[in-house]
Regions:
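A structural signal for well-ordered alpha-helices, especially hydrophobic packing surfaces
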Residues: 17, 21-31, 50, 54-57, ...
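Peripheral, non-transmembrane regulatory/ligand-interaction domains of membrane transport proteins
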Residues: 2-4, 12, 30-46, 51-54, ...
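Disorder-to-helix initiation segments
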Residues: 1-16, 35, 69, 73-77, ...
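Hydrophobic/aromatic-rich structural module bridging two neighboring secondary-structure elements via a short loop
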Residues: 40-41, 45-49, 59-89
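Secondary-structure edge/capping motif, primarily at the C-terminal ends of alpha-helices
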Residues: 24-38, 60, 64-71, 94-105, ...
Length: 220
């Protein structure tokens, strides 16, 4: 487990990932119970979640500026924070596009992808919870693979949704609007995968350092 002084960073990541889960669940709720008259209020609720994530991101950056010793490389800690923050930005971006393109009803394909984004965010939170155990974890790699798999499934859903949109869409303006919404939904899954890739890269780097230490001690 990470030492107590280090827990701030890992706790921050878990908090950000939890906010991502909240945002994804809200997005799914908006789609499943869609009411055009309520979309502005829903956008404000989503922005409040995104703003809370921004605050967490800034808290971590402020801590990095003054920290003498950090549990991981500063660049890696900041990269992870930025990656998590981007997930929230993209989820909010979906609702923004539904709002400013004045979408009046939600396509069933969008609800399916939103559920997949929620799955990715939940797995991402599990990954952040497990991250402090990176030295001995037996599940960290499995969670990375799980998120990669969910992202691949989201990609396939996105392709099918875009196909349905262009085959069945009658209103050119509606097609354009939904192309943008679908793209941002797919970005959400991509960003979750990016978080997993950052974790994978950090753990790989630490493994190489751990392997090289005995060699340096032997003077090889």
């Amino acid at each position: 487990m990470a030492k107590k002084p280090d827990s701030f960073y890992f706790d921050n990541y878990v908090a950000c990932a939890d906010l991502a889960v909240q945002a994804a669940e809200l997005l799914t709720k908006i789609f499943e119970n869609f009411d055009p008259a309520q979309i502005h209020d829903m956008l404000n609720k989503m922005h409040a979640i995104e703003h809370a994530a921004d605050k967490k991101h800034h808290e971590l950056e402020d801590a990095l500026l003054t920290a003498f010793i950090t549990p991981l490389e500063r660049e890696d800690l900041d990269l992870m924070s930025c990656a998590l923050d981007t997930v929230l930005d993209r989820i909010e971006g979906v609702v923004q596009r539904v709002y400013f393109t004045n979408i009046q009803s939600i396509h069933p394909d969008a609800i399916v992808i939103a559920h997949k984004v929620t799955d990715a965010c939940r797995a991402m939170k599990d990954l952040m919870v497990e991250l402090p155990n990176y030295r001995k974890s037996k599940t960290l790699r499995e969670l990375v693979i799980q998120i990669n798999t969910i992202e691949s499934e989201a990609d396939e859903l996105y392709i099918n949704a875009m196909r349905n949109l262009h085959v069945n869409g009658k209103d050119p303006l509606e097609v354009i609007a939904w192309r943008d919404v679908y793209a941002f939904l797919e970005y959400c899954a991509d960003c979750c995968e990016n978080v997993a890739d950052v974790v994978d890269s950090i753990v790989m780097k630490l493994s190489l350092i751990h392997i090289s230490e005995p060699t340096r001690r032997r003077g090889i």
